[in-house]
Amino acid sequence: MAERNLLKLAEVQKRTALSRSSIYAKVAAGTFPRPVKQGASSVWVDTEVQGWIDALIAVRDQQHAA
């Protein structure tokens, strides 16, 4: 199994260039990976966040190629 790391909200914001409210709105809409509860905090699985980013890039590349 691939190694997975957990990301705090600040790191997710940095990697995605999204605001806190945008991240949670996308989670609520089902278009962004759901966080994992770690005590009172929420964290995200790094491979899931990277997969979301990769999917955006793939859509862009498909549109550009068409």
Question: Where are the regions that the model predicts?
Answer:
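C-terminal secondary-structure termini that scaffold catalytic or DNA-interacting sites
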Residues: A58-A66
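Beta-hairpin "wing" of winged helix-turn-helix
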Residues: P35-K37
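Minor-groove-contacting beta-hairpin "wing" of winged helix-turn-helix DNA-binding domains
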Residues: S41-V45
